[in-house]
């Protein structure tokens, strides 16, 4: 069990405290999904619907990772889940609908829940570091969802492809905005905020798109988040002055220094 101090996000910025404070987890995500699409799902008994939604999407993510979403048919999904075609139609009417549901759920439910844990005050550097950590922590918790959106968007309908691109543009713009705030405040030094934001986002996406590599290297979620924040400081620091943490916690350990 976590102590009150350990659960004190955002002062204690580690994966454990984030999970403790985030109002959704791997186990509850399908209850949230059912609530989001209650009007579209024909099965109205929540317990039965949540159980089958987990089966359907776990199988979808697995089939897509092995052979690609484009090659997957609803018949393949039926065989993998053991749910009849008629049963599947109680939850999804088509592959396009399935892909759209995943995109909408990420952008309209999961992302807002995560961003509610962003720092509302503090320096641009503190807010940027917190946002980077949130991206990494969410990528660890909901890796199959993020991987599906970014890896399979090329084989989706145009609407889903455009939506996936928009996710990327929005995230890049937010990182760029925080970098430019830091530069304006004299806290950061950056000659190209657009490229720096894009580079940071690419490292975030690498975390959940190539998880096998980090698992093989035994890199933990906190290891990667600490590395990314440390790299951010190096990229944005004045060459003549070493950037130091002003938040009261150590970015390299996730532990409070006070």
What do the predicted segments below correspond to?
Residues 1-49, 245-258:
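N-terminal intrinsically disordered/low-complexity leader segments
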Residues 51, 55-62, 66, 80, ...:
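Alpha-helical structural segments
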Residues 63-97:
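Helix-turn-helix
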Residues 111, 159-185, 194-198, 209, ...:
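Amphipathic alpha-helical packing segments from all-alpha helical-bundle domains
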Residues 116-144, 197-200, 225:
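Hydrophobic alpha-helical connector segments
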Residues 138-141, 181, 197-219, 232-245:
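Amphipathic C-terminal alpha-helical segment
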Residues 140-159, 211-212:
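Amphipathic alpha-helical segments used for helix-helix packing
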Residues 147-150, 191, 243-245:
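Short, hydrophobic secondary-structure boundary micro-motifs
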